[in-house]
């Protein structure tokens, strides 16, 4: 069980909830990192007194350094700071809750130190899954997923002695705020519309990804990497209630599912306490009041991002890094009101058509594909 954490992405939704859980469990916090939020990271640093605080933005880091003068907390900036936080000796678990491909190098740095990785940064496995999983095997690092769906699958597989027994993984999906709409109806949806998720409270980027179903597409790729399965054995299913977090179907026809309230603190707690379970102060799921549970097939005509993700997964190589980089760029444009909702999938498809795919890529190849895809999506 975890005793000390380094938290990458402390000011985001997952980061804030991780600190709540860490406080409940009595864990020590050795490092906190964020992008630009000086005020919140200062508040967190004063409360949890880590040895290291990192802001990716250099000007923000300078401001934080002045504010934390006299506290004994070291302040660093940029990727150098993220790498230092990920590799610090006293942290036995690194929680990677940063958004986007910026989490890739720090995750690899933590893996090379043989640490447990509580992985909430799906882009790491999407872009460089084979590199990451091979490195984890080489250095004896343990990867425990924090995404609710992958945590559910991870839990369902605990009694599985042979992955050959798995017939398929079923990742559940709420359908987002636009479930039931056609592609034409989605043409004029705004960022404000997309940010109204029916069940989960998340950051803006992942909420938009949930609205386009790209989030589920990325999770399909992540599951392929985590569990070493072909794309044909990973499937998305619409489950509006977000009670069943995912399912595993075995060769004998048995279907195991993990159920719980739509609360990210549950998978965060599990990732930090695995292989043990601890008492939670949160209200558990009441099956007698949760009502009917429904399941349906996703509409890939209305939500082409899911189809594009499956395509990239089948192509392999750097195609998934191209998919992810283009999507990050397109979602940023959408959130700033510069493009429409359906333009996100159009920009991603354009990048997949224009950027050459490299097979058996190095880390440098992956990062170059990410950069080229972002440019192609603009």
Predicted segment positions?
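Catalytic, metal-anchored helix/loop core of enzyme active sites in primary metabolism
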Residues: 1-378
